[in-house]
Each structure stands twice: as structure tokens, then as C-alpha cells.
């Protein structure tokens, strides 16, 4: 019966030899003949396990430094022949060929090779597996008759099935799907490494499951994390991150990287991927106090990111409120011990920058994905243009630079009122830019913050003068925005009429 074929002959060719000796010994004990290649065959022979060299099956030696071993009709015919097609089996017999019922293959470590910073193109090319991929695809295509294994974690389950009589068709199909996913990932990694065009005609995606998640944004949504999140963050304490935690962590870290640790200590407080308070100071404790003062309600259950190692003074201050996550480049031992006392708090160490790590941002849409460059353009104040009669003072210019760094991380429509070292009011996600300004002003009033003498940043142009007039009425004396409205002259005139300074950056920072 198809899918219940007896395994008589196995082919083994593995780079990762984890568990291969034990697995091969178990197959041998079941009376299964083993064919093997190169290093795999030597390892098995040294362990006392009979393994027939593949050249004995093909009648052809390995050539070209091992580049050609299994690429031969004697191997692939044995894999591809359908056992339920008499003509196939007769053809095998006519050529004195034998079916191969089990393939155990894993591939050269291309991804690990190109991860080395000093790798050369020639070294990368040497790690592109050809024969192994062909074996996996041939075996997986004929999965009702041929078992295919790419992962040592599956050895034990297959052995259990073989000892019980056979491996059921459903499991054979699962293993075949895993093999095709393995080769797809492998080829996608190679294509990404060799690709030079920025937006290719075909976008191969290959991410391994990093971890399953309890659920997605909401409990009724299934979810998992793919890729290598652990390359950027090490979790030092707390239960596993949720889907929303991961989104907030990325948003918080992306924002805090706007502020180099060499310039000042910086603290960013995030809720639902939006900043609710950002500040810089001589030390983290003072930066925390200023950031928290922006909004004393929203930070509860939020995410805190800092750009310097956490010390005990900062730890004692943030320990007074509940925060889901604290992200820092490091934690002093006494600070770590204190923060670990709350079991529901997660502590993450940021181990490498996320800015610039990904060439592209992806977002799913019906039928596909949207792809764009991340909005990681550096702040270049020299390219800004003063458009009002009055230029910003030095203090206002410093505040404008600070506000512009923050506003790009606020959901559109975004308005940020700020001083040179802290946010004063943040308006996020309103359909009207004027409403975002009103929200920011209201939040500042709720926090008891005086906006007189503040500056205001807008992530996109002011389409009408009313937004600027509202900002000036709230107390702002300088404004930064991209510019580009058909009513720019009207908007500039409103600023001039109030004696305010306005700067055009020429760069928009929509965030949806």
C-alpha cells in the first residue's frame, strides 16, 4: 500500500552529524542497508556500522573534490521510481538498480558561513550544496514511498515508526513538507546573499520559527515569531515575550537608538508602540524623571528603553511602577537583582543595534506583502531650511532637533511638543493634525506642564495655517515640519505673524 512501504535501503549524507551514528546503528539493527558518502561514510565505518560507499552503487567515483557524488541516475532513479507503477519497477530491474526508501540529508552550512564578517565570495560559493538539495527534493517528491529526514530531531520518531511496522503517510507528508521548506530556506538565503538589485522581481523569504507565541495581538489569534530575534535581545528575566511585547520592544529600541549614549543618557517610555515620554539628561535617573513627567498614567504596563547600563538609582526609581519590559545595553548586578524581584517584569539586554540591521520592512496585504526601506534616515540639520523671518535661537534649535528625533516614532498624525531635553506633550494617531495637536496640549495640561516657550514637531506638513496657529496659541515659539503644502506661504505667514520660527526639513515621517 502506498505510504506503507517497507524500508530496505537508506542513503545518508549529512554535514551535521548529530545523532547520526546512533540512528544508523538502529537502522542497521533493523536490517536496513545503508549507503553513504564521504565524511558520513567514514564516521559510520569508524563506529563499526556497515555503510556502502555511494560509488559502489553508481559505479562512478566521487569527482571534482566531492562536488559530484550522488548526482547519478543510479541514485535518483532509486528515489523517484514509483512503487505503484509496474513500468517504473521493471525499468529499475532492467538497469539493475535498487529502490532507495529512506534519505537522511542535511546541507552545507551556507547561512553560518556568510554570517562571518570576513567571509569571501569564494568561501560562500564553496558552501552552496548541490547534490544534497537534489536528493532532498527527489525524496520529498516521492514521499509516499521514500522517507526524507533533514532534522536530527526527527530521527527518534521515525525509528519508533519503523520498529512498529512503518511510518504512516501523514508523517511521511509532514517530513516531505519539512524537506521542501528546508531547501526553500536554503535557496532563499543564497539568493539574498547574491542579490544586488534593491527590489528584486522575486522576493524569496526564509525565516525559521524562533518560538511559538501564546497568541497574537488578541487571544483568539494564533501567532509565532520567525527569524532571529535573539540576535538582538537577550532575555535576562521574566516570562516569555508576547506578540505585543515584541512589537513594543522593537518600537522602543528603534526610538532609543536615536540618542547615542555618548551624547547623553536617554529614556524612552513606550505604550502600544507609541512613545508616551522621552528625555535625555546627565544620568538615567534624571532622564527617567523627565520622561515620566510627560505622562504619569500611560507608562503603567508600558515598555522602558534606555541607552546606557542600568544603575541602582534608575532601578529604584522605575521599580516604583509596573512596567512590562525594561530594555538596556546592560544592568549593574545590584540593579538586576532589584528588578528581578518582580516576576512579571521582563528584562531584556540589547546586544546589537536594530537600526540598519534590516534592509527592508515588510507588511502583509491581501495577496502579498508591501516592501520598503526602513525609515532610518539620519538627522541632518544642515539640510533644514528656515522659512520664517526669524530663525530659531540656539536653545530652540536644540529643542527642534530633539523633537524631530521623537516625532518620527509617533503614529501619524503625529505632533510632539518638546524642550531641548524632553517631551512635553505627545499627540498620536489622530485623523486630523489639529486634533493631534489638541491631544498633545491636553496631555500636557493633564500633566501640569506649561507649554510656553516649547517647540513643536509635526511628522508631516501642515495643510492649513490652523495647525500652526493652534501650536502657537498653546505656547510654542518654534516649529519643525517637512513643508511641501500648496498653502506653505499661508502657514509661514501665520508663524511670522506670531513671531515664531519655522524650519522645513524636506523629509516626511509618516508612520502607519
UniProtKB/Swiss-Prot annotation:
Entry annotated with the keyword Transferase: yes
Catalytically driven reaction(s): (6R)-10-formyltetrahydrofolate + 5-amino-1-(5-phospho-beta-D-ribosyl)imidazole-4-carboxamide = 5-formamido-1-(5-phospho-D-ribosyl)imidazole-4-carboxamide + (6S)-5,6,7,8-tetrahydrofolate; IMP + H2O = 5-formamido-1-(5-phospho-D-ribosyl)imidazole-4-carboxamide
Alphabetical GO biological process terms: 'de novo' IMP biosynthetic process
Superkingdom: Bacteria
Annotated MGS-like domain residues: 1-150
E.C. number: 2.1.2.3, 3.5.4.10
Pathway, per record: Purine metabolism; IMP biosynthesis via de novo pathway; 5-formamido-1-(5-phospho-D-ribosyl)imidazole-4-carboxamide from 5-amino-1-(5-phospho-D-ribosyl)imidazole-4-carboxamide (10-formyl THF route): step 1/1; Purine metabolism; IMP biosynthesis via de novo pathway; IMP from 5-formamido-1-(5-phospho-D-ribosyl)imidazole-4-carboxamide: step 1/1
GO MF term list: IMP cyclohydrolase activity; phosphoribosylaminoimidazolecarboxamide formyltransferase activity
InterPro entries registered for this protein in UniProt: AICAR_Tfase_dup_dom_sf, Cytidine_deaminase-like, MGS-like_dom, MGS-like_dom_sf, PurH-like
GO cellular component: cytosol
SUPFAM superfamilies per the UniProt record, alphabetical: Cytidine deaminase-like, Methylglyoxal synthase-like
Keywords: Hydrolase, Multifunctional enzyme, Purine biosynthesis, Transferase
Domain notes for this protein: The IMP cyclohydrolase activity resides in the N-terminal region.
Protein family (similarity comment): Belongs to the PurH family.
Name of this chain's protein: Bifunctional purine biosynthesis protein PurH
Organism: Chloroflexus aurantiacus (strain ATCC 29366 / DSM 635 / J-10-fl)
Amino acid at each position: 500500500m502506498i505510504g506503507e512501504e517497507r524500508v530496505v535501503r537508506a542513503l545518508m549524507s549529512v554535514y551535521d552529524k548529530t545523532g547520526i551514528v546512533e540512528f544508523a546503528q538502529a537502522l542497521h539493527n533493523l536490517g536496513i542497508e545503508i549507503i553513504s558518502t564521504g565524511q558520513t561514510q567514514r564516521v559510520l565505518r569508524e563506529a563499526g556500522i556497515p555503510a556502502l560507499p555511494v560509488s559502489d552503487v553508481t559505479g562512478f567515483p566521487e569527482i571534482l573534490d566531492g562536488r559530484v557524488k550522488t548526482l547519478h541516475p543510479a541514485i535518483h532513479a532509486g528515489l523517484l521510481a514509483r512503487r505503484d507503477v509496474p513500468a517504473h519497477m521493471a525499468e529499475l530491474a532492467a538497469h539493475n538498480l535498487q529502490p532507495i526508501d529512506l534519505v537522511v540529508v542535511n546541507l552545507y552550512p551556507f547561512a553560518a558561513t556568510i554570517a562571518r564578517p570576513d567571509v569571501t565570495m569564494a568561501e560562500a560559493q564553496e558552501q552552496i550544496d548541490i547534490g544534497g538539495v537534489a536528493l532532498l527534493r527527489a525524496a520529498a517528491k516521492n514521499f509516499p514511498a521514500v522517507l526524507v529526514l533533514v532534522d536530527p530531531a526527527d530521527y527518534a520518531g521515525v525509528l519508533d515508526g519503523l520498529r512498529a511496522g512503518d511510518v504512516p503517510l501523514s508523517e511521511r507528508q509532514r517530513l516531505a513538507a519539512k524537506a521542501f521548506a528546508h531547501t526553500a530556506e536554503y535557496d532563499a538565503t543564497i539568493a539574498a546573499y547574491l542579490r544586488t538589485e534593491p527590489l528584486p522581481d522575486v522576493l524569496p523569504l526564509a525565516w525559521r520559527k524562533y518560538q511559538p507565541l501564546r497568541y497574537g495581538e488578541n487571544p483568539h489569534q494564533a501567532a509565532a515569531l520567525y527569524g532571529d530575534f535573539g540576535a538582538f535581545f537577550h532575555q535576562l528575566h521574566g516570562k516569555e515575550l508576547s506578540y505585543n511585547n515584541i512589537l513594543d520592544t522593537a518600537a522602543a529600541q528603534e526610538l532609543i537608538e536615536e540618542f547615542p549614549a555618548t551624547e547623553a543618557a536617554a529614556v524612552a517610555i513606550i505604550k502600544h508602540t507609541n512613545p508616551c515620554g522621552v528625555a535625555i539628561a546627565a544620568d538615567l535617573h534624571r532622564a527617567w524623571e523627565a520622561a515620566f513627567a510627560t505622562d504619569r498614567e500611560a507608562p503603567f504596563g508600558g515598555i522602558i528603553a534606555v541607552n546606557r547600563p542600568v544603575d541602582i538609582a534608575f532601578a529604584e526609581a522605575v521599580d516604583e511602577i509596573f512596567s512590562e519590559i525594561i530594555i538596556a545595553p546592560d544592568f549593574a548586578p545590584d540593579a538586576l537583582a532589584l528588578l528581578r524581584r518582580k516576576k512579571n517584569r521582563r528584562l531584556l539586554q540589547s546586544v546589537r543595534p536594530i537600526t540598519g540591521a534590516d534592509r527592508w520592512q515588510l507588511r502583509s496585504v491581501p495577496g502579498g506583502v508591501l516592501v520598503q526601506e526602513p525609515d532610518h534616515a539620519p538627522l541632518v540639520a544642515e539640510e533644514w531650511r528656515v522659512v520664517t523671518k526669524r530663525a530659531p535661537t540656539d536653545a530652540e534649535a536644540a529643542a527642534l532637533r530633539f523633537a524631530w528625533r521623537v516625532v518620527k516614532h509617533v503614529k501619524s498624525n503625529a505632533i510632539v511638543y518638546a524642550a531641548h531635553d524632553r517631551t512635553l506633550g505627545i499627540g498620536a494617531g489622530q485623523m486630523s493634525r489639529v486634533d493631534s495637536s489638541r491631544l498633545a496640549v491636553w496631555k500636557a495640561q493633564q500633566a501640569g506642564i506649561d507649554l510656553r516657550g516649547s517647540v513643536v514637531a509635526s511628522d508631516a506638513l501642515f495643510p492649513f495655517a490652523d495647525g500652526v496657529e493652534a501650536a502657537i496659541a498653546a505656547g510654542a515659539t518654534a516649529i519643525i515640519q517637512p513643508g511641501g503644502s500648496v498653502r506653505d506661504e499661508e502657514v509661514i505667514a501665520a508663524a511670522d505673524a506670531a513671531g515664531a520660527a519655522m524650519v522645513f526639513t524636506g523629509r516626511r515621517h509618516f508612520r502607519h
